[in-house]
């Protein structure tokens, strides 16, 4: 069975939605999966993913001549006329299933869905029920983890003093996680630590994919419920920190 999955969202959107690959591969072992991202640079996200047979950009999809048994559209911004460039037998997701169109405002950031995590949302879009599956990135870090090291990836300067005053890290050595544009180099840095403190959603998801314990410093409400898989907690940052 040939499946085309489209997600033109952010790196976080693609990493989280990769979870559906686990179920698709289990249900249909002979499945051939093509995943479409927005830009050619985004294709790197799935560089090591063996569950995907081919990764293409939106530009490449526009000129693609192929036939797919199923299209799973995970992005409300996908121009539907683009899909007409290829032959599709069956469809799921945005634009094809009215029951899931309410998720559009969640992905756009206009609405919150506190009772549902991001995995449940993507599984619903793909016509499945989430049963605890995690991420499917396919990369295994080259670095070694140290139990005595806590990684800090905090972009907001006001939070740096807050985290040392409010979060008990059991006298662990603080390790600054440097900014890395390449997500795999970022994962190598994250993997050096056993616990992670961050206010960044990408760092949060990458750390959870590596089964790290995460302290997430939440400044604003998130659009979906954060699923820690038992490995983390949220610290609601009070407004006085920024006064």
Predicted features along the sequence, with ranges:
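Catalytic machinery of carbohydrate-active enzymes
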Residues: 1-243
